[in-house]
From Swiss-Prot:
Domain of life: Eukaryota
Name of the protein: ATP synthase subunit beta, chloroplastic
Main location as per UniProt: plastid
Keyword Nucleotide-binding: yes
PROSITE patterns linked: ATPASE_ALPHA_BETA
Amino acid sequence: IVTKTSFLSFEISELVKKNVGYITQIIGPVLDVASSPGKMPNIYNSLIIKGQNSAGQELNVTCEVQQLLGNNEVRAVAMSATDGLTRGMGAVDTGAPLSVPVGETTLGRISNVLGEPVDNLGPVQSSTTFPIHRSAPAFIQLDTKLSIFETGIKVVDLSAPYRRGGKIGLFGGAGVGKTVLITELINNIAKAHGGVSVSGGVGERTREGNDPYMEMKESKVINEQNISESKVALVYGQMNEPPGASMRVGSTASTMAEYFRDVNKQDVLPFIDYILRFVQAGSEVSALLGRMPSAVGYQPTLGTEMGSSQERITSTKDGSITSIQAVYVPADDLTDPAPATTSAHLDATTVLSRGLAAKGIYPAVDPLDSTSTMSQPWIVGEEHYETAQGVKQTSQRYKELQDIIAILGLDELSEEDRLTVARARKIERFSSQPSFVAEVFTGSPGKYVSLPETIKGFQMILPGELDNLPEQA
């Protein structure tokens, strides 16, 4: 008789159970496991450790093989806490990489890095699983069409428009509005485009995971009454979990998004919040695996790890994946290796300014620092391009004049410069926009502004049609 133990998508038969190793060393979340001669697990295979701790509580830890050490030993990284594990405990090689449930049944649910639900709504009823390590699509499969992805957010659509099927980075320090902007984008895209989103929370704090979840339920992006009508699947690797979980939760989210693209042939929006914590988790794991650190203490494989994860997030002829990634900028330094490495892969960058946030202008997007490969007249059209350039030129001149204004005052400027300053301030205030997901805090109903309306509004400010109106108007 062959007995089977169900674990996620794996059914570990007695035949596989014969490939059992044992723990020889535990260093925090990193484990060394000895296996039988000739039966060493492959790189990225998942190992399952079951047993009891000293208090008699059941333990169930999944690890991923990272290094083959020789002498029939491998080094693995745990995906959950290793508290209670002891040397000599058995470790079962599943014979395959970690696989997670995919498909419509994941919508409206919160899963961890292993694909297990953590929202107390019962198991995810999915018969389909995908391994989290998958190859990027071949070049011949890629979709090379260029089209704008309208977000309904004025300053984004005008200054640095997003490409459908592109990769977008939201750059900003702490507290400038990255998470709110991501949640607003999920809301707008679900309602205006009818697409599905996958939100990958990498190293999330409680607030960062809980607040968007509650806001999505309020805005019906997650439908509690009929969960199957939800438009987003959430995957969280929490901050209190080992670095292995944060390092792989992005791969789990990408895998779920790839199913909607490749099988359902849908347009998908994976949101990664934050990509920096993926880098930090990789740095921790790299140090624990004994690799020499590189610049600023980051892992020497930073470029390779970033490239392998980013290349999977792409559009094919079957469907598009438009990825939006929040990039925390340490100490507001854009030259730090983490944001610098990330920006090399992006089609558009939306930079959030602390100065604008301090003025109460939200979303605090800086049109001068934000860039997009779509900002070309032959892609967006002459009218859009000229308007965006006019906004940037006016904002740049205002920025140049700020030191003079601070020292000598506004009255010392020429008439032309005073007009420029007045128009730049109107542009700043016109760029702000009430958010759907922040209605409960601001008391102002959210607004979705189409691209033609956005262009028309800025075109009225630039030549001075609205010079007679006060800034507050």
